[in-house]
């Protein structure tokens, strides 16, 4: 069976250690050898990122340059209109074939609101969900029915993620990193130091392009 590939989407405005450190820890926990970062195309009716699509993509590339675990995929940024997560995952599944194990990485905060996503009940028919812990969020879902859905698909065995192409949920005990892109943008606007929040090469790019001022 092909090796497990995991996809991790985000605005990455900018990418920072709060993205990279938990996902790196997750990769070690479950034996991932490939994580694909996918910067999001933000819908026009939502607040737009402060950095352009290309700048967000380039910062993601810089952040993982030389790290064999990560690659960056710009397919979402190439779209003329934003798409639902399930659409992207179904396209990836079609590319990879029926038998390839696919994972989609989300934070604990997203798991708690997953039932509001478009066609959320179809997600596990396409991929596994790999969930990174997030500070300050509860560990149970909103209703008994949702909790039962989680319990029915939950696995504590990483090998399940490699031996099955989709259908499992893995709750990873990853480091709780209290860094957010909002905090970084605010610190930049206040002239505060950010060197411990994101890779030096990304901070250098931000400085050179005058971002988040």
Swiss-Prot record:
The organism's taxonomic lineage, starting at the top: Bacteria, Pseudomonadati, Pseudomonadota, Gammaproteobacteria, Enterobacterales
The species this protein was found in: Pectobacterium atrosepticum (strain SCRI 1043 / ATCC BAA-672) (Erwinia carotovora subsp. atroseptica)
CDD domains the UniProt entry points to: NMNAT
Similarity section: Belongs to the NadD family.
UniProt-recorded name of the protein: Probable nicotinate-nucleotide adenylyltransferase
Pathway per the UniProt entry: Cofactor biosynthesis; NAD(+) biosynthesis; deamido-NAD(+) from nicotinate D-ribonucleotide: step 1/1
Gene giving rise to this polypeptide: nadD
Keyword Cell inner membrane in record: no
Primary role: Catalyzes the reversible adenylation of nicotinate mononucleotide (NaMN) to nicotinic acid adenine dinucleotide (NaAD).
Family annotation (Pfam families): CTP_transf_like (PF01467)
Signal sequence coordinates: none
InterPro entries reported for this sequence: Cyt_trans-like (IPR004821), NadD/NMNAT (IPR005248), Rossmann-like_a/b/a_fold (IPR014729)
């Amino acid at each position: 069976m092909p090796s497990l590939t995991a996809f991790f989407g985000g605005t990455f405005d900018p990418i920072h250690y709060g993205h990279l450190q938990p996902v790196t820890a997750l990769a070690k926990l479950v034996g991932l050898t490939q994580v694909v970062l996918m910067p999001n195309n933000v819908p026009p009716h939502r607040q737009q990122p402060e950095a352009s699509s290309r700048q967000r993509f380039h910062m993601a590339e810089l952040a993982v340059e030389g790290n064999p675990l990560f690659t960056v995929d710009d397919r979402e940024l190439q779209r003329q209109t934003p798409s639902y997560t399930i659409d992207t995952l179904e396209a990836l599944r079609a590319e990879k074939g029926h038998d390839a194990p696919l994972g989609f990485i989300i934070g604990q905060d997203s798991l708690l609101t997953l039932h509001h996503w478009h066609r959320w009940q179809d997600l596990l028919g396409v991929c596994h969900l790999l969930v990174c812990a997030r500070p300050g969020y509860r560990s149970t879902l909103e209703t008994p029915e949702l909790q039962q859905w989680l319990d029915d698909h939950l696995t504590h065995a990483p090998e399940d993620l490699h031996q099955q192409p989709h259908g499992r949920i893995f709750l990873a005990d990853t480091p709780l990193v209290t860094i957010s892109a909002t905090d970084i943008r605010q610190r930049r606007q206040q002239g505060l130091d950010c060197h411990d929040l994101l890779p030096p090469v990304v901070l250098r790019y931000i400085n050179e392009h005058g971002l988040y001022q």
